[in-house]
Amino acid sequence: MGSEQALSEVVESAKERFGRLRHLVQKFLDDDDVPQECLPLLQECAEIWSSYVDACQDITMQAPKEDANRLSKGFLRLNETAFLYYMIVYTLLEDTLPRLKEFSSNKDQNVRNLYGERIQLLHNDPNIERIRNVIENYPKFIQLQTIEPGKLSSMLHFHGDALLLIDVRPRSEFVRAHIKCKNIICIDPASFKDSFTDQQIESVSLITSPHSDITFFSNRDKFKFIILYTDTQLHNNFQQRQTRILAKILSQNSVIKPLSGTKILILENGFSNWVKLGGAYQSSVSETAHLTSSSSTPAFGSPQVPTGLFNQKSLSPNKDKSMPMVSMNTQPLLTTVQRPQLPLYYSDLPIIPQPSPNRNSPTVQKFSPHPPTTLSKLNTPSTIQNKANTVERISPDIRAAQAHAYLPPASNVFSPRIPPLPQQNLSSSRQTILNNSQVLDLDLIVGLENIGNCCYMNCILQCLVGTHDLVRMFLDNTYLNFINFDSSRGSKGLLAKNFAILVNNMHRHGAFTPPNVRTIPVQTIQFKKICGHINPMYSDSMQQDCQEFCQFLLDGLHEDLNQNGSKKHLKQLSDEEERMREKMSIRKASALEWERFLLTDFSAIIDLFQGQYASRLQCQVCEHTSTTYQTFSVLSVPVPRVKTCNILDCFREFTKCERLGVDEQWSCPKCLKKQPSTKQLKITRLPKKLIINLKRFDNQMNKNNVFVQYPYSLDLTPYWARDFNHEAIVNEDIPTRGQVPPFRYRLYGVACHSGSLYGGHYTSYVYKGPKKGWYFFDDSLYRPITFSTEFITPSAYVLFYERIF
């Protein structure tokens, strides 16, 4: 095997490329308000042609830097942009304008002359043919090359200054151990996607990286070789795929620094193989035994191995004789990286006694990324689906699991809880936590910088950071065990990791804060950039709805940690299955739907925040019903337009039976036509952490400012559906998963809104335990409340409750 191997990656063909560009031209013309008079249309052509000329000048300036055999994708995009401008003008002059009625009858010589000049410019343009050739001849395959470990070791020894190594693994793995090289950086594989350019790698992927990494990457064009490597034994498909994507970005998507003089290579077989063969690496002491224990006799790096990898051919044939064999110590050089011990966590909240385990008050189990044991005996997904879709009784073995369904944890419990699951060997950090006696404060008091109309984000962050079970998993790094790199629905850990960074910064500045000490506000700009990268809605400085941001953040964290995120969505129920489901009690049907939901959506976020409600339509003629089940992490309840109301009025409004208007009547599948019908919502699952949005804005964005009275202690048991016929039915064949009344809650956070949706301001109140009490947060400012019920406010918009017993 040679020192370099070509890896072909199929890219867009010339035919596909031209088809895509012509589609964009047509889309522009369809979307644009094209003038219907000759002179204005000619003027628009002149403006677009000016843009075309500018694009051609950019191409001319960039062309000398381009290798004809290795054009960058940035250069291709310049040519594509120019081609788009040309084709828009071409279509307008050759097709659109001659079709205008005014054109054939127009006697204005000035218009005729202008048209002739534009056509002449179009047909005599000297650039378009060259632009077409670049687009047509852009490589159909991108050649990625690999380098053998022996050759890399030799190059590091003799030409180390000419090499930049990029470790494409999570930073935690990089810190534990990486190839020994002074010019090395780490780019997390979850921090970029295939559409990125080198500029986005610098501005997004490296946003939280050390300054040295950013400096090395900004000087990447000064290195003769860039070597990428990952670990082929961990997250195999994802990390290898991301490494190849990064190589393509650097070779083809380099916009600000084309690497025409730099060769990009990928280390063959990754980091584990490098260590196994005796390559030099830097490691924390705690990882040394693990890395070396599985290594066989080094294949290179030892004088006793004359036939080792160092006898292979060099990257450059003419350098073979000038590169003598390198003798390397078989014991890698170690740089000790001390790991801080992870402490226990402290909360001012009083410890609430847990009920003793029994049928109605089950025990709490630890979180595990495996599917629920209540379905573990069903061996295949199809079997699971069939069981969940029918009324057939589930195996009696499942009944025993009912004793393990859990209730919300008391505040002295160490980790987020999830239903009873098979155990998996998790990170040793959990044991470190349990074995350490140090105590940390979870009631963080620190302000957040407002970097421009981001108060909607700050108020939600303050309330979520008041959720101890959520904060705990991001402080002790438990969340890292559950990032799903294979899921196509999340950001592959990008959002979760940056949320963890923010939480740790808030903890660093806001833990153990004395009442009379003012802390430095925490910067949120990096976290907001990541949010804007994932959802462009949050990329600018426009004001947004805080409850929508809360929904976005919880959904994003869930998808990053979703253990079943890579599974296909379940098929919809058949008509027969729906009919059978309608015959069930509401408790049984909703529990089955929840089990189906967990098969594709299973995370600690679901465990903490997710609830469920049923929506039932009923025909008033034949009484046929149809019930659907929806999950929620933020429950939006309507605010009645009255002078005064309390939150239970909102829940009554939410769950009342509504007679549908003529325009909204349900098309009854039994009557086979639209009939007078009703709709009713019932809450079928109440979560541990209940987030309630008071719907103050109507469809026209008019705000209802009525003062909604909400209590510190809230009992929602009457609004938890036992059954539509009010029968208390106990299901013995499916787990309760904590859905055992009563459902009593305690308020711990309030997000407030004053003003209009587009011109208002967001603040928050958060409970910091009995010693510190309630605090008011207004971006970077904070203070204790000035009177005991200040947090009960007319401006309340989103309420945060936690379940108690």
From Swiss-Prot:
Reaction(s) catalysed by this chain's protein: Thiol-dependent hydrolysis of ester, thioester, amide, peptide and isopeptide bonds formed by the C-terminal Gly of ubiquitin (a 76-residue protein attached to proteins as an intracellular targeting signal)
Record GO terms (molecular function): cysteine-type deubiquitinase activity
Biological process, per Gene Ontology: protein deubiquitination; proteolysis
Active-site residues, record numbering mapped to chain: 455 (nucleophile), 761 (proton acceptor)
Domain USP: 446-804
Stored InterPro entries: Papain-like_cys_pep_sf (IPR038765), Peptidase_C19_UCH (IPR001394), Rhodanese-like_dom (IPR001763), Rhodanese-like_dom_sf (IPR036873), Ub_carboxyl-term_hydrolase (IPR050185), USP_CS (IPR018200), USP_dom (IPR028889)
Alphabetized SUPFAM superfamilies for the sequence: Cysteine proteinases (SSF54001), Rhodanese/Cell cycle control phosphatase (SSF52821)
Domain of life: Eukaryota
EC number(s) stated in the UniProt entry for this protein: 3.4.19.12
Pfam family, one: Rhodanese
Keywords assigned by UniProt, alphabetized: Hydrolase, Protease, Thiol protease, Ubl conjugation pathway
Region of interest: Disordered: 359-380
Recorded GO CC terms: cellular bud neck; incipient cellular bud site
PANTHER family from the UniProt entry: UBIQUITIN CARBOXYL-TERMINAL HYDROLASE, UBIQUITIN CARBOXYL-TERMINAL HYDROLASE 4-RELATED
Family to which this protein belongs: Belongs to the peptidase C19 family.
The name this protein goes by in its record: Ubiquitin carboxyl-terminal hydrolase 5
